[in-house]
From Swiss-Prot:
Keywords: Acetylation, Calcium, Magnesium, Metal-binding, Thiamine pyrophosphate, Transferase. GO terms for molecular function: magnesium ion binding; manganese ion binding; protein homodimerization activity; thiamine pyrophosphate binding; transketolase activity. Gene3D superfamilies: 3.40.50.920, 3.40.50.970. The gene is tktA. It comes from Escherichia coli (strain K12). The record marks 26, 261 as: Important for catalytic activity. Its cofactor is Mg(2+); Ca(2+); Mn(2+); Co(2+). GO terms for cellular component: cytosol. Thiamine diphosphate binds at residues 66, 114-116, 156, 185, 261, 437. Homodimer. The modification N6-acetyllysine is found at residue 46. PANTHER family: TRANSKETOLASE, TRANSKETOLASE 1-RELATED. The lineage of its organism: Bacteria, Pseudomonadati, Pseudomonadota, Gammaproteobacteria, Enterobacterales. This is Transketolase 1.
Amino acid sequence: MSSRKELANAIRALSMDAVQKAKSGHPGAPMGMADIAEVLWRDFLKHNPQNPSWADRDRFVLSNGHGSMLIYSLLHLTGYDLPMEELKNFRQLHSKTPGHPEVGYTAGVETTTGPLGQGIANAVGMAIAEKTLAAQFNRPGHDIVDHYTYAFMGDGCMMEGISHEVCSLAGTLKLGKLIAFYDDNGISIDGHVEGWFTDDTAMRFEAYGWHVIRDIDGHDAASIKRAVEEARAVTDKPSLLMCKTIIGFGSPNKAGTHDSHGAPLGDAEIALTREQLGWKYAPFEIPSEIYAQWDAKEAGQAKESAWNEKFAAYAKAYPQEAAEFTRRMKGEMPSDFDAKAKEFIAKLQANPAKIASRKASQNAIEAFGPLLPEFLGGSADLAPSNLTLWSGSKAINEDAAGNYIHYGVREFGMTAIANGISLHGGFLPYTSTFLMFVEYARNAVRMAALMKQRQVMVYTHDSIGLGEDGPTHQPVEQVASLRVTPNMSTWRPCDQVESAVAWKYGVERQDGPTALILSRQNLAQQERTEEQLANIARGGYVLKDCAGQPELIFIATGSEVELAVAAYEKLTAEGVKARVVSMPSTDAFDKQDAAYRESVLPKAVTARVAVEAGIADYWYKYVGLNGAIVGMTTFGESAPAELLFEEFGFTVDNVVAKAKELL
């Protein structure tokens, strides 16, 4: 039987060989953390390589995602669908082993990591999901939700601001089943970290309310095992295991230096490392007895089978809850949602109201909340402004089975935590802040889109229309930056009806996040036929029209739709054949078939005016170089909103004048 050290050395060998073959990558972290990974994965981790999506598996997150060969080695050795050929194709086009781990590409990878600090944030989200789901579904004698979230993190994660945001919240929420391993090797890309990172990390985490285990020898299996047992015994606090490790462990000339961090060791050094580790096998060769000891297929299947029996007993005792749990873990919509949502939208159209779209959003949450027990909402300390609370909201810090998170002023942390909640399954998270502060959350927003995760992002106070707070709080370029993010769906509704349609779209969307861009100020409701009402979901539609072919088309979104309608009415009265297109979602519109797009924006009509209180440049793709744009080209100013709209040209007279220049 191979020793624990030999089992860990299998990870080291695969990691240095794959990085060498790829001619790029990060061998240092996998080599340094191999002993920790061996103990966690072989002695503690509850998982089934034959079913990577088993609901009650433990979640493992590699927050220091550059060390991706660590997780690929573990998945390969324990029996996941990751053959040796894929390890040989590390970092190559269309392989299952991309440079940083990507969820959806590789069976067993729980989240996409690489931007440092976001993995631990996702892990906090997963731990919140586990704790909340357990409170919602477990019953006396039936613990069907009972698993841990384990995260590996390095010095880079610790330095990133997001780790401060999310680890602080994790302590406050007492996430006892979150266990993080700190790879304390003292090295980052620039060299030894003493020059730029001298925090007392243990005291920092104790101040957050974590259980901290100091001075673990990260290369001694017995010490690591004792620490994990201690952490699992602490149920009311997350645990940080501070593991002293040597980066590039086993490399005679590069261990303990930044040379092993982000580059292949080189053939000569790899040969010396094999010698030092006593690893007698050729590159990519693993002896059968080491495979046999690593193989987790049988044990994993046994664990899942035992859980299946538990779940069958639960289903017998609580059939309704079991059916609901299954539906939610599959991410399926309730069967009656579509019909009830359409009924709500039709009722709104029949009962006009002049309200802010942020208020319309709250009304939609109020209507959809009772239909969607999977909602897990939250705001970055702006609930009274974002209007994200509804009558059924219960904060999880007050009621463990609740459905609302007070994130505090942590926009980046909030968004990345919500990604983790979404990845875990069983919930549909929505988050909120002022649109301006999407800037703080930006990379987690991008990661949601990249990972195709469901999340409804509620962004209010969407333009100069917020008024007196001034340019620090007035978004200009933010909507455009969301629109150009691949796989992000962005909606800027013009009234309560479009707001509800946008919410329905975001809730039903299965393959990515949806951003709702909402006003502070009240917006007039537009009249619509049944056909126009149905066409809102297509992203853009004809709201006002003329007989026959128009000479001129206005395209507008959000608060500027009523301005475009007023300009249209003025020109129509003067005998101009004009049309107004409301375009709440450019991405939804762009997905429509060519015939529909042509029916809304005929190519023959080149006189087009886009009106939006956001950055002007975005609209050239719709108005062409011969069109006109009434938009923002500078930052805003501090003044009452109505004066600002006048100052920046958002008036009927100016819009009409721009239109006439094209005729």
